[in-house]
């Protein structure tokens, strides 16, 4: 089996109605992990649903999905991510021709077709403060170079990490080598962590613009400084620097 897709749902039945029909024909196996048992009632034929025995973190649910599937590649896709036709094939084809590509992500766009930057730099203390405090009001979204690569890619390009909250192809052998995702992250930063550990193990991270995914991420949560999402992100960053203290001294 070539590609297994894992979708973690926290009660996103409405989003799944749009994304699963687009995703299912592009993969060999599709598993929905329902973090809220019984919250996923209707799925396309051939899609498996596994109820989490108790509420777990996103990363822990991804690990459960990886363990319950068998594809050489695991596509982690969010309920609100809709791959365009041929997107998964483009990701897999690239990975097949680049044997050290451990993580391969698509070009992510908003529902209106505008670019959504998803290839990012590993975090620094300065960058986190710039992005997660009122300092971010000093610049327009995504125009800075502290956290993101600033131009829409036209060719495959390597980067530090790719936004796991949209759609991401991971090589199973890489996941086995680095120990999977870290389920200790409550929400946010787990995608940075898995990419960082992959990088330290010598695996490449690529964005392939021939693969396109529409992502309806609710950007409003990023605008409130003291929202629970901001606090979750800062908590995740604290865990990240405790695991990887060398990032405290990093300038980029």
Regions found by a protein language model. Give the residues of each.
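Conserved donor NDP-sugar-binding/catalytic core segment of glycosyltransferases
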Residues: 82-118
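Glycine-rich, basic loop-to-helix element that forms the pyrophosphate-binding segment
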Residues: 52-69
């Amino acid at each position: 089996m070539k590609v297994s897709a894992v979708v973690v749902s926290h009660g996103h039945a409405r989003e799944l109605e749009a994304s699963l029909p687009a995703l299912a024909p592009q993969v060999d196996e599709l598993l929905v992990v329902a973090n809220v048992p019984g919250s996923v009632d209707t799925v396309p034929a051939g899609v498996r649903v596994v109820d989490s025995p108790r509420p777990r973190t996103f990363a822990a649910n991804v690990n459960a999905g990886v363990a319950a599937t068998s594809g050489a590649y695991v596509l982690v896709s969010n309920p609100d991510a809709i791959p365009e036709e041929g997107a998964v094939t483009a990701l897999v084809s690239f990975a097949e021709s680049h044997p050290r590509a451990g993580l391969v992500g698509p070009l992510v766009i908003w529902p209106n077709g505008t670019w959504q930057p998803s290839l990012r730099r590993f975090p620094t203390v300065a960058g986190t403060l710039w992005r997660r405090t009122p300092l971010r009001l000093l610049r327009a979204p995504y125009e800075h170079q502290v956290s993101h690569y600033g131009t829409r890619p036209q060719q495959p390009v390597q980067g530090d990490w790719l936004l796991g909250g949209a759609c991401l192809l991971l090589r199973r052998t890489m996941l086995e080598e680095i120990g999977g995702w870290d389920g200790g992250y409550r929400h946010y930063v787990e995608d940075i962590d898995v990419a960082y550990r992959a990088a330290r193990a010598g695996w490449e991270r690529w964005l392939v613009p021939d693969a396109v995914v529409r992502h309806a991420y609710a950007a409003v949560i990023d605008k409130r400084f003291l929202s629970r999402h901001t606090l979750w992100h800062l908590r995740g960053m604290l865990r990240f620097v405790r695991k990887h203290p060398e990032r405290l001294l990093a300038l980029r």
